[in-house]
């Protein structure tokens, strides 16, 4: 069983690398299997088909992001800090996590904005974020607002990560702070102090 799980993890890693490097259109089962020197049959045995493999890779990346936020979210309950300080203390590790994984971010960007995401992973993505949304809703005036604002923050992070990955922006503390300020000023009117 451990060997099968090892195959699965290696194939997930390979799918991320191939999509990040070559795009979804070139992420064939042959290219993914070749990345780890496996026969394509291992994709079908472990995932059923390429689409299920890509969805599983997306799900793993999605859950990793949510877990990272959840790992640091307790800072939002520190009453001795201002709202801005608490939000900034949450921002720093979330931003670092996002920009420190360029292949995962490239894969995520390509999959998240694809038709395949809309047809097979959209609901999964919403389920992955339910726990985070429930936790974040306590910091907003309305739980309805928290869904929209969480999506806004998430997509803003993705957008700025893409600018950094393309070389348009440099990942510096000053740029991170500018992005934080942009997001914070947008969220502040909707947040509880």
Where are each of the predicted segments found?
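Amphipathic alpha-helical packing segments from all-alpha helical-bundle domains
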Residues: 66-71, 100, 115-151
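N-terminal intrinsically disordered/low-complexity leader segments
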Residues: 1-6, 191-193
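Short helix-capping/turn signature of helix-turn-helix
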Residues: 24, 47, 110-116
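Short, basic, alpha-helical segments at the C-terminal edge of helix-turn-helix-like DNA-binding modules
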Residues: 59-66
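Hydrophobic alpha-helical connector segments
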Residues: 56, 71-100, 153
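Short, leucine-enriched amphipathic alpha-helices that occur as contiguous helical runs
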Residues: 4, 8-16, 50, 152
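Hydrophobic/aromatic-rich alpha-helical bundle segments in the mid-to-C-terminal region
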Residues: 106-110, 126, 138-184, 190
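Helix-turn-helix
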Residues: 10, 18-52, 56
């Amino acid at each position: 069983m451990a060997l099968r799980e090892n195959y699965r993890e290696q194939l997930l890693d390979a799918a991320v690398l191939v999509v990040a490097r070559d795009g979804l259109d070139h992420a064939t089962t042959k290219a993914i299997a070749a990345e780890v020197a496996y026969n394509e049959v291992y994709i079908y045995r472990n995932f059923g088909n390429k689409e299920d493999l890509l969805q599983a890779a997306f799900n793993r990346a999605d859950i990793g992001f949510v877990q990272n936020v959840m790992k640091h979210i307790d800072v939002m309950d520190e009453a001795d800090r201002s709202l801005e300080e608490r939000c900034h203390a949450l921002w720093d590790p979330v931003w670092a996590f996002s920009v420190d994984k360029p292949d995962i971010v490239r894969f995520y960007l390509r999959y998240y904005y694809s038709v395949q995401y809309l047809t097979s992973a959209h609901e999964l993505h919403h389920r992955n974020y339910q726990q985070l949304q429930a936790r974040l809703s306590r910091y907003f005036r309305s739980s309805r607002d928290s869904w929209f604002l969480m999506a806004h923050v998430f997509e803003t992070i993705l957008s700025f990560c893409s600018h950094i990955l393309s070389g348009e922006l440099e990942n510096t503390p000053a740029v991170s702070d500018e992005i934080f300020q942009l997001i914070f000023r947008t969220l502040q009117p909707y947040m509880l102090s």
